[in-house]
Amino acid sequence: METGSPGKRPVLPKRARLLVTAGMGMLALLLFGPRLVDIYVDWLWFGEVGFRSVWITVLLTRLAIVAAVALVVAGIVLAALLLAYRSRPFFVPDEPQRDPVAPLRSAVMRRPRLFGWGIAVTLGVVCGLIASFDWVKVQLFVHGGTFGIVDPEFGYDIGFFVFDLPFYRSVLNWLFVAVVLAFLASLLTHYLFGGLRLTTGRGMLTQAARVQLAVFAGAVVLLKAVAYWLDRYELLSSGRKEPTFTGAGYTDIHAELPAKLVLVAIAVLCAVSFFTAIFLRDLRIPAMAAALLVLSAILVGGLWPLLMEQFSVRPNAADVERPYIQRNIEATREAYRIGGDWVQYRSYPGIGTKQPRDVPVDVTTIAKVRLLDPHILSRTFTQQQQLKNFFSFAEILDIDRYRIDGELQDYIVGVRELSPKSLTGNQTDWINKHTVYTHGNGFVAAPANRVNAAARDAENISDSNSGYPIYAVSDIASLGSGRQVIPVEQPRVYYGEVIAQADPDYAIVGGAPGSAPREYDTDTSKYTYTGAGGVSIGNWFNRTVFATKFAQHKFLFSREIGSESKVLIHRDPKERVQRVAPWLTTDDNPYPVVVNGRIVWIVDAYTTLDTYPYAQRSSLEGPVTSPTGIVRQGKQVSYVRNSVKATVDAYDGTVTLFQFDRDDPVLRTWMRAFPGTVKSEDQIPDELRAHFRYPEDLFEVQRSLLAKYHVDEPREFFTTNAFWSVPSDPTNDANATQPPFYVLVGDQQSAQPSFRLASAMVGYNREFLSAYISAHSDPANYGKLTVLELPTDTLTQGPQQIQNSMISDTRVASERTLLERSNRIHYGNLLSLPIADGGVLYVEPLYTERISTSPSSSTFPQLSRVLVSVREPRTEGGVRVGYAPTLAESLDQVFGPGTGRVATAPGGDAASAPPPGAGGPAPPQAVPPPRTTQPPAAPPRGPDVPPATVAELRETLADLRAVLDRLEKAIDAAETPGG
């Protein structure tokens, strides 16, 4: 190897330079190539869905943050390096044996600019990239407005705390990072060039090093003073008193807040003492100031509040925390919209006073009682409506309502989607998987309040064709025949929850002009996609990009891809909304509806904040389990609004965002940040609005908060005596809370069907029923919450107690033993329904599923029995239990003959139910069990009792029940004042 003359750097041969250059290029391509591909694909996709302005705004915001933070950090660090380098000692002994940094110093001296600029720029870019994730804070600060509500402590508008304060904190944090990095860079540079020597016995520091380090240390302390000042405002979101309440308490206001001001003053004095090192050589002054700051932070900022909390607040907490609990109550009600303007409270006895058949509201409620459980029937839908092995329904079906022939009816609904996971054999070939099996077929609904027929023979239930949904199918076949209960003009489904489970998730549609259709449509027809959705891959550049993205060379060589081909990506409705509106939080349960003849997914979207002063924290997301098994709570928020309703067209993927809360200042802020992306509420079609449901995620948050925040008096709030709890799910062994349920019930004023989301509530650490919460979904009253409050000493049983009472009933227990010989038992949703002018009716469907004896055989649930229960009048918590193949028979068992006539009978078609009493032969009406707190015994029966005698006894008992009813009414009249 040739070497140059002394003093010249060695030169690499030309071939070596080419290899190094090629290697660096390959490394850069590997590092940045996939990211550049993703950026270009996003550019194409956002343009296809019409939201490219969102992508550009977010990108420019993040680039601006990167540039600003990188410039500040790199500038400060570079200035520190430059000052330290220029003020280095003129002579530093270059003796490696005595100076361990001498080789490094020599290397730096050969290329000082490269090292200086390289370190500064690298640190700046890294900090800028990390800071770019704060783009949401920047946009909220730039476009934020006011709430029109001021905080109770400082008198500032809430907008300051949620829009401005997070931005100020972020700016302060990055300034702090920049100054600390500059201090460290100065320290290392002075050490490298001899301004700081540690090799001598006591060390040495040059004047230039002392001044520079002191200035940067003073800047750090000065920034800490600003941090103490901002800490004062963040006390209003303090978690010191959690779980009792959120926000500043007595200790925060009377100890922490003054302590922050004291620490601000001390930090400023400490910073000034560091700056005096510019003129004074004695470093003991800043050292003592720093010690004073640390000691003050411990004593004033830590020990003083701790002592006040321990010896002054806790012994008198109920009194001293009272005004701060009141602040928390008011803020939480406002932040979650659970205040008096949105929640109506009504006293409710919990014991029925009338026969349901005599109450118009109850007649409607009973006729609409939902017997089909969307959590159980997905496999039934799949087995009976699948058509092909590659079609499937969502694991949990949905509930919605439709007006058919003028009658409002709730339906269990699902979309027959393509299931990529169900493809087998040659169906999984790349061509078939991505170009042939591309879409689902149809919308399937079933009336939620009835089945095709009652299943009566317990021993042969699994062999009967009873207890199954009555389907209304809107697909390609029914479109051709013209027989559709719910008219759908375009039943093909290219976007959905199930179809998006493909890995990777994409379909290739279209082809060369004039080419034959290849997408599977039916057994006798194929189809070519004509929708607007999809990114064009008709040119070779885009094909190459997608071949790179999906690591699939067949994009380049397949003859199935032509000039008109497009690729459909991001097919999950929820994901599409999240991508076009990254500032929204989406509900976990999109649901399909039919609007104007098209299948559309509705996605509820929320605006959220996490710094609303004094508001209780909660989470819209359930616990998340990491791959390592660690369970983490979802994102904590302190403000939620269901401000946007989003729709995704199931055929072409069109995403539309509709404003749904004109009063939400957070949504108004985002609409200013992304103009034109959210349509005004006036543009919501009436047919679409009729299908809006109150979202489950929001309701679950609100009911958990109402369990505490229905209490008005702070002292009572502190004692927790009046709190409620969300009941555990009696049908689930995993200790989960009972999910809310959608029901169609009679409206209290008009007795017309009203679609609501409801939940029972039990007492705090008790199982007795305490309240019943329902949220209206009808357009006229959407969002209104109704709370029925039971007396605090109520003995009305809650869901878990009722479940125990029902399954321990001797009739249920004995037949369950018979059923379990060849079936698995599934208990459906336990519905709680206000009824009988003060009472609560519990209804629970019981499903059976035949135990499979062959791996190839398929089994699925069917409705076999209906359990009902009500509280016995005039007893200490006794209940009546009804158990029969139909709801009508079960109701007659608990209310007496006649009530069951208003229930919807099995049979009919999906559009209309059979007339009352047309549900087939039913056994004679049973008499309510005796009034007792114990489960009723099964009626005696045996082969030695003649049938005529049985009929005579039943008739006599029915007459006796009528006499008892008249006697109860007479007693009520006698006890009524003035009666």
Curated annotation (Swiss-Prot):
Matching NCBIfam families: PRK00068.1, PRK12438.1
Signal sequence residues: none
Top-level taxon in the UniProt lineage: Bacteria
Major site of localization recorded for this protein: membrane
Biased composition (Low complexity): 902-912
InterPro entries per record: UPF0182
Keywords, comma-separated and alphabetical: Cell membrane, Membrane, Transmembrane, Transmembrane helix
GO cellular component: extracellular region; plasma membrane
Protein name as annotated: UPF0182 protein BCG_0095
TM annotation in the entry: 19-39, 63-83, 114-134, 174-194, 211-231, 260-280, 288-308
Organism: Mycobacterium bovis (strain BCG / Pasteur 1173P2)
Membrane protein topology class: Multi-pass membrane protein
